[in-house]
From Swiss-Prot:
It is found in: Cell membrane. It comes from the Bacteria. It comes from Aquifex aeolicus (strain VF5). This is Biopolymer transport protein ExbB. Signal peptide: none annotated. Keywords: Cell membrane, Membrane, Protein transport, Transmembrane, Transmembrane helix, Transport. Coiled coil: none annotated. The lineage of its organism: Bacteria, Pseudomonadati, Aquificota, Aquificia, Aquificales. One of its GO terms (cellular component) is plasma membrane. Involved in the TonB-dependent energy-dependent transport of various receptor-bound substrates. Protects ExbD from proteolytic degradation and functionally stabilizes TonB.
Amino acid sequence: MMEEIKELIDYGIMGTLLFMSFVALAVGIERYLSIRSTKVENFKSKAQLEKELTKRLYIIATVASNAPYVGLLGTVLGILLTFYIIGEKGIVNTKEIMVGLALALKATALGLIVAIPSTILYNFLVRKVREKLLDWEAIHGECSSSHE
């Protein structure tokens, strides 16, 4: 059973986090290219423009907000594995404890490594959306009611 938990951490948790990072990166690149090439003058309505510019940004935000939790799940499983080994053997084997804790910390670190750049990417793209909306307002003579 403990071997399955170790494999779940190594392949399940780490694989999920790597998949999440690739999804965030792919969506981020696609959104950046789309936002950059969007011609604001082609939109009669600001709402239509905003809808077009913000497509799929929620995916990046979801990855950014959930990656730490996936990493935390790996941490909990790694610590569970460590305690199980200690309890089952009745003696403290430093090597096995360190391997279990290293596995736990690896999951936490990878969760943060995925979350932090995803958050930065999301905020960058939201800023680009705001710039395009301001360009639309300038062209159409509308003033934004909120100033940031």
